């Protein structure tokens, strides 16, 4: 490499035969622009950091809005709710604010392999959940963007200019050339020390919003899994109804054959045959109607799992006959735990925290804006002498500006931020109230459905006995076929009601799990 040589006889505009100045050994001994900028920033940054260490951010520090949770749920006094044994592969565990362990898959407490398989597809395939994930990732990136304001901004530039001045202008000097060149390379640094905490409050708000977004994602995940389980049990309940209607159709076909044989034997009537045929076709129509509802639930399940509906089907399996399926007991815990277990409550609380940070941002506008700047580089009329000591230049500066009059704008923005916080705090308390109401509804619903199911089963037994007696009486010629039809219709209605109650118990059980937050707790929020 040829060294750059400088002749004292040559002026700044004299061109020398030299390599690119960036390759000059002198440039690298000087450290180039990075070292110049480092020197510029170090002294000012050290002073600013020393001052920042003792500065607290303006605005109120956040504390969670208060809420007095009851000691126990009202409806738990009327039912026994105990934790079930954990199923193989992990099960739903009662959450605790101090327990940050990842919970198992709560739907496994129902011990249904088909349901487990469908639920597992949600995390990998559901586009709604993917949308929520991307929303959270965008909010997390906003935190990184806000944190970047803690650091200086650095920029660099280079310029080359060839200019001719007017010989008749004020800058003309007789005897000197009117044409000259100007070459420059420089770097700039700018830093806003966070004396008043505006940046810290901005990061605080961004972090709280990101946590709220993460809680939203968890809430969507919980809702999708709960909807999948509820739809699945509805479908299995319809399978049970279809199985019942199938057996009823067979029974009614036998009854129709009996009435026809009795008519042929001269001991029956055409009215009996017509009534039997009417009852048979009515039940067949009911079976078709239930099949339509089943198809709709199958479509809903396939949509949640993001499956092609043309290739998707769920095998027929009546609810009461599904292997291993049993209604589990769901651990409820105490109301104070609900504040940590429901993601929608956590999301509302984090938005209140973000709104509180916005107050500090608004208050910081009442304080001066302070900015530290530095520039360093080289400038020369000769590219050959550009990267040399005499060509170096630098500047350091500090700027402070204070807004003296804004017609009350800052006061209005601060008041608006305070009202926004109060609104978010109220929304947080409202979410808690709705959550407690939801839990109480689900607990009472399960208890009442259990009682109703027991009563309905007695009604089914009585209706079955009535039908058996009426059928025997008809076969013995003691009564008309109308009595048999009435008893059979009553039996079928009670049997369908019993199936519906069983289905609703499973759906309500899922609703209770959902109202309790599933296996989630606030310790799973990103920090």
Each model region followed by its residue ranges:
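Structural signature of outer-membrane beta-barrel domains
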Residues: 161-165, 304, 377-381
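Bacterial N-terminal signal peptides
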Residues: 39-53
């Amino acid at each position: 490499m040829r060294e750059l040589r400088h002749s004292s006889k040559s002026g700044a505009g004299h061109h020398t035969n030299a390599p690119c100045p960036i390759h000059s050994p002198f440039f690298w001994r000087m450290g180039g622009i990075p070292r110049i900028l480092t020197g510029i920033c170090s002294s000012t940054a050290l002073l600013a950091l020393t001052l920042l260490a003792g500065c607290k951010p303006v605005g109120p520090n956040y504390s969670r809005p208060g809420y007095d949770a009851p000691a126990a749920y009202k409806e738990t006094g009327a039912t026994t709710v105990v934790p079930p044994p954990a199923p193989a592969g992990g099960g739903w565990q009662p959450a605790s604010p101090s327990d940050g362990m990842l919970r198992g898959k709560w739907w496994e407490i129902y011990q249904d392999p088909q349901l487990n398989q469908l639920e597992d597809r949600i995390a990998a395939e559901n586009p709604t959940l993917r949308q929520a994930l991307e929303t959270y990732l965008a909010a997390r990136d906003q935190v990184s963007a806000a944190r970047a304001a803690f650091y200086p901004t650095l920029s660099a530039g280079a310029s080359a200019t060839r200019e001719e001045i007017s010989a008749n202008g004020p800058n003309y000097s007789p005897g000197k050339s009117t044409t000259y060149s100007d070459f420059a390379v420089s770097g700039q640094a700018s830093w806003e020390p966070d004396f008043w905490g505006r940046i810290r409050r901005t990061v605080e708000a961004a972090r709280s919003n990101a946590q709220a977004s993460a809680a939203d994602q968890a809430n969507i995940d919980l809702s999708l899994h709960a909807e999948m389980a509820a739809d699945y049990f509805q479908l299995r309940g319809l399978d049970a109804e279809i199985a019942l209607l199938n057996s009823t159709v067979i029974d009614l076909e036998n009854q129709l054959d009996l009435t026809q044989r009795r008519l042929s034997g001269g001991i029956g009537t055409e009215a009996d045959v017509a009534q039997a045929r009417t009852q048979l076709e009515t039940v067949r129509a009911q079976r078709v109607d239930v099949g339509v509802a089943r198809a709709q639930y199958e479509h809903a399940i396939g949509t949640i799992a993001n499956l092609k509906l043309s290739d998707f089907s769920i095998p027929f399996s009546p609810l009461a006959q599904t292997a291993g399926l049993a209604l589990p007991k769901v651990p409820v815990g105490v109301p104070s735990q609900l504040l940590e277990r429901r993601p929608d409550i956590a999301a509302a609380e984090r938005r209140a925290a973000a709104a509180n940070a916005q107050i500090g941002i608004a208050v910081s506008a009442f304080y001066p804006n302070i900015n530290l700047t530095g520039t360093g580089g080289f400038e020369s009329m000769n590219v050959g002498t550009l990267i040399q000591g005499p060509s170096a230049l630098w500047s350091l500066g500090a700027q402070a500006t204070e807004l003296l009059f804004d017609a009350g704008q800052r006061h209005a923005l601060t008041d608006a931020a305070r009202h926004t916080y109060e609104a978010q705090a109220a929304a947080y308390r409202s979410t808690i109230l709705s959550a407690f109401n939801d839990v109480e509804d689900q607990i009472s619903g399960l208890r009442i459905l259990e009682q109703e199911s027991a009563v309905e089963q007695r009604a089914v037994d009585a209706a079955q006995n009535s039908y058996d007696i009426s059928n025997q009486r008809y076969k013995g010629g003691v009564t008309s076929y109308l009595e048999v039809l009435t008893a059979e219709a009553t039996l079928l209605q009670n049997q369908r009601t019993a199936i519906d109650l069983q289905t609703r118990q499973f759906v309500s059980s899922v609703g209770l799990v959902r109202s309790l937050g599933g296996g989630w707790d606030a310790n799973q929020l990103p920090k």
